[in-house]
Design a protein with these regions (language model features):
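Acyl-donor binding region in acyl/amide transferases
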Residues: 75-126
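Active-site rim helix/loop that mediates acceptor-substrate recognition in acyltransferases
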Residues: 30-52
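Conserved donor-binding loop and adjoining core beta-sheet/short helix segment
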Residues: 47-90
Length: 138
């Protein structure tokens, strides 16, 4: 039986403990964009430069999704980059951005940016397409 999901930010000191459980999820997010997972991602997570967010089953503790965020200074001000995200039971955690928006506001961010598939546009309320990435296979 599956329970309700809770969205939680993993404390950097705890991230190394759960990394084996979420590594493949994070890598799946990179793979969806045809990218390799950066070798230094674990170090960034360990030192709190990159935060990990998880969707956890309240009944059995199973992690159903994982995502990364990173605060980045830009010309407009501090920006929260929503990074790689993957998992299952998306309909149960698709409103995760509300928690991340609260976090970003508390940290003084002026906006949130994410790069992903077009399907995210339907899921993330209030987000709009700002740029387009074009590709041509050779």
């Amino acid at each position: 039986m599956s329970g309700a999901l809770t969205i939680a930010c993993v404390e950097p000191q705890m991230a190394s403990r759960i990394w084996p459980k979420i590594r493949d999820m994070i890598d799946k997010g990179y793979a969806a964009g045809d990218n390799f997972m950066p070798e230094d991602i674990v170090e960034g997570i360990r030192y709190g430069k990159i935060l990990v967010w998880i969707a956890v089953d309240e009944e059995n503790g199973h992690i159903h999704a994982a995502m990364t965020t990173e605060l980045v200074p830009m010309r407009c001000g501090l920006v929260c980059w929503m990074g790689q995200c993957a998992g299952d039971r998306m309909h149960d955690w698709s409103k995760f951005h509300v928690e991340i928006e609260k976090y970003a506001k508390d940290e003084g961010c002026v906006k949130i940016i994410l790069k992903g598939r077009r399907a995210w546009e339907r899921v993330l309320e209030g987000f709009r397409i700002r740029t387009v990435q074009l590709e041509k296979l050779l």
